[in-house]
Amino acid sequence: YNFDKKMINLLSSINKRAIYKNYPRRNYIDTNPIDDYAKKFENVKVIDGNYDFRYVNTLGDLFIISNVGQASTITWMINLGKPIIYLYTNKSDFLNTQAIDLVKKFFIFIDTDHYGWESDLKNILNKPYSELKKMWKDKQLYIDKYEEEWLTGKNLHAGKLGAKYIKELILQNTKK
């Protein structure tokens, strides 16, 4: 709740309109209080309800995510070709070092455990959209390089990737 509230305050202070869509949760019987809070700001539009991202993805020009665990949402976003800002924290994401390095290459990366991250994010969001697109285009080299293996591979799925990883690990550890 506090992180979402901080994000909404930050979004309300940038020089652009913002759309806020939280990840659907069933924590509340009534309206999610963070949605009600966000509606108080003139430049923040709240998407109510549990709409799947693919049905509302055309509304944004840039996306901010705080979890790479929603794989389908991530792949939808990447395929849109619009800038993605990833808010990383070691408090809830369980990414190994290799995954963190890849995420830094794929996305505009903000470490929310770092003092002053809010200012860093605000500075990025206040850039002209053409600069944001350039930042994103610079990431495309890495996305293209790793897309099939790590992101949106059309012939892969988690079971095959997991089996491939385990097989390689066993082979590496049994060679003498």
What are these regions (language model features)?
Residues 1-36, 151:
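Conserved catalytic-core segment of nucleotide-activated headgroup transferases in glycan assembly
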Residues 15, 59-61, 81:
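Short, well-ordered alpha-helix to beta-strand connector turns
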Residues 18, 46, 84-85:
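Hydrophobic beta-strand scaffold residues
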Residues 31-50:
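Nucleotide-activated donor-binding/catalytic signature segment of Leloir-type glycosyltransferases, i.e.
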Residues 35-36, 41, 67-154:
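Catalytic binding pocket for nucleotide-activated donors in carbohydrate/polymer assembly enzymes
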Residues 50-60:
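Short acidic alpha-helix that forms the nucleotide-activated donor recognition element
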Residues 58-69:
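Acidic donor-binding loop of glycosyltransferase active sites
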Residues 151-176:
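C-terminal alpha-helical cap of glycosyltransferases
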